[in-house]
Amino acid sequence: LNIPKGRMVLLVGGSGAGKTTFINAITGFEKADAKILLDGKDVYKSFEDVKYDIGFVPQMDMIRYNDNVRKTVLDAASLRLPISISDKEKNEIVDGVLDEFGLKAVEDNMVGKLSGGQKKRESIAMEFVSNPSLFILDEPDSGLDGVLARELMEHLHRISREGKIVIVITHSPDRVLDLFDDVIVLAKDADRTGRLVFYGLVEEAKAFFDRDRMEEIVKVINQKEEGGLGMADELIVKYGEIRNGRK
């Protein structure tokens, strides 16, 4: 895969398709039998140099509920920013991030008192302090209603337009599909091994799978015992032939 900067990418696949393994591989948490390059640097060989250029927000909020908003983001900045940065610079960066995510007005509030949407933005802000070029989010819209979910995804879309790669896993992709540039589709083959079924533009994915909705695409590739159509293997072959220049 070659993902250009400035793209917002949807990652979809059924349960056990390899989404978590894929994310762990590109973030350097697990070493895959592959070369992962970020800005020309090998993630595995130069992990200490690139680890803070990768932002990862897990599905569960990894935040301290018994501390205030600013202190939580400031502590994240202390971990993610170079030690050469002064306290003054660090506080200026935190101010900018709090503004960016609409948290400045509640910076003195306890995190536990925030709304669900604010907690999501707090989690994202903690990773954003190091201004990563690769931003990965696992179900950032989980637990949010349609309006709040769209507002959050629109914000992530704007972040991608700043020249960053934003990769998002969501179980409700169709309500925000227009915000994504590309889609990565993973599926289990007959041996129950996670495989790449498709990577490309959203509209190309619709044509490839002959489906208009991502939820329908996942059903196509899921195994029959999981309520799917069990077409993963033939589509894996089809995509491989396309990548190799054969019809």
Predicted segments — roles?
Residues L1, G14, L38, I93, ...:
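Topological signature of polytopic alpha-helical transporters
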Residues A34-Y44, V50:
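Conserved ABC transporter NBD signature motif
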Residues E89-V106:
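Conserved ABC ATPase "signature" region
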Residues E127-F128:
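ABC ATPase C-loop
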Residues F135-E139:
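Catalytic Walker B motif of ABC-type/P-loop ATPase nucleotide-binding domains
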Residues T27:
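Helix-to-loop junction immediately C-terminal to a conserved catalytic motif
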Residues M110-L114:
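Conserved ABC ATPase signature
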Residues M60, Y65-P82:
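Q-loop/switch helix immediately C-terminal to the Walker
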